[in-house]
Amino acid sequence: MSFSTLMDKRERGSFDSQFLIAMPGLDDGNFARSVIYICAHSDAGAMGFIINRPQQITFTDILLHLKLVDSNDAIMLPNRTREFPIQCGGPVESGRGFVLHSDDYLSESSIPVSDDISLTATLDIVRAISNGRGPQKATMMLGYAGWGPGQLENEIANNGWLNCPAAEELIFDRGLDNKYERALALMGVDARMLSTDAGHA
């Protein structure tokens, strides 16, 4: 199921604006110890973004690739722009960029995900960020995680994931190393005590 189809068909599914937290038994290399923010969930499937996987490419690299700046301009970019976070959002459409952001920035192409968070996947927000006119809180994801009809529900029922309400501060926090433990802590779970047989919230 494509990103556009899932977003077009989205309803207020039971896992909208939830975190999925990988159980220890989930050994898929794409998702082991991952925390995923679910943006859309309906009968058509689900999609979301891994929020604790670093990406080697930098925002400056992206600006150069898109020819929004040249090499001379890139040197002059302010630190806030050069250090803008890029993450691996998931294995689907991994060459495509998506920006999760606070709702103080909205364009015609922005899609509300929750009361406070929107998603924009067009060049206008990249330009705005590069010019210092972007949202106060934002992170760029390359790719996303997607599930077909009923697939996510089955994975949760089979103890592949824990789920809990998402916390905005964790989505936009640039410290990725301990997000897994912090997401579990939202549920009162100590990662050291978690077994592959635990249930879900």
From Swiss-Prot:
Domain of life: Bacteria
InterPro entries named among the record's database cross-references: AlgH-like
Annotated Gene Ontology cellular component terms: cytosol
SUPFAM superfamilies (UniProt xref): VC0467-like
Family annotation (HAMAP family): UPF0301 (MF_00758)
Family to which the UniProt record says this protein belongs: Belongs to the UPF0301 (AlgH) family.
PANTHER family per UniProt: UNCHARACTERIZED PROTEIN YQGE, UPF0301 PROTEIN YQGE
Descriptive protein name: UPF0301 protein Atu0781
Source organism of the structure: Agrobacterium fabrum (strain C58 / ATCC 33970)
